[in-house]
């Protein structure tokens, strides 16, 4: 959201919706006149009921794109199908390496020399959607989970706005399971 403000994008954020009442993004939205809505998953008896309420809330704002950030719940297949090709996520690893949780810890344990973040379309399989772009950071001697996570987060803040901007400018599309960016980019991996 900050990148959109700083660069004066030809788009607007129609809402920030979170399942966590204390999410920082909600405060940022409120401070900037963007509707901020909580759909707390704990208020629902089933996952299907939560997903239906979440979808109803999202649909009330008619977004062209849904950009997940810090959303740590697995969505149901019907929910994902509803927004196919219009929902993206950022994941703190160079997918397909280290899907799921604890990515930085796992990268350090594996002894990799580079780590990073991936922006991908959301599909039914967690963290396996078509990759839009990635950002690499080096794993430095002496890194711990916190130092590596901080470096990856900075990269996330570079590549997520890039992918969103491609979408809002009509350059990014999902055709079947293939990411199409037109005109093509010279690079899809951003390096620190």
Pin down the residues of each PLM region.
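Short beta->alpha connector loops at strand-helix junctions that form conserved
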Residues: 37-42, 90
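Conserved acidic residues
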Residues: 14, 64, 85
């Amino acid at each position: 959201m900050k990148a959109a403000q700083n660069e004066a994008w030809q788009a607007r954020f129609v809402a920030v919706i979170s399942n966590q009442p204390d999410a920082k993004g909600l405060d940022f939205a409120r401070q900037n006149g963007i509707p901020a809505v909580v759909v707390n998953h704990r208020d629902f008896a089933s996952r299907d009921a939560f997903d239906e309420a979440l979808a109803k809330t999202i649909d009330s704002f008619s977004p062209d794109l849904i950009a997940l950030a810090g959303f740590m719940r697995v969505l149901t297949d019907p929910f994902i199908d509803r927004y196919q090709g219009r929902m993206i996520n950022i994941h703190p690893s160079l997918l397909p390496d280290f899907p799921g949780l604890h990515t930085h810890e796992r990268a350090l344990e594996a002894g990799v020399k580079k780590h990073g973040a991936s922006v991908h379309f959301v599909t039914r399989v967690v963290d396996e959607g078509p990759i839009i772009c990635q950002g690499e950071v080096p794993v430095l001697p002496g890194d711990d989970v916190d130092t590596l996570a901080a470096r990856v987060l900075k990269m996330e803040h570079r590549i997520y706005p890039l992918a969103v901007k491609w979408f809002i400018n009509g350059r990014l599309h999902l055709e079947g399971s293939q990411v199409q960016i037109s005109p093509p980019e010279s690079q899809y991996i951003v390096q620190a």
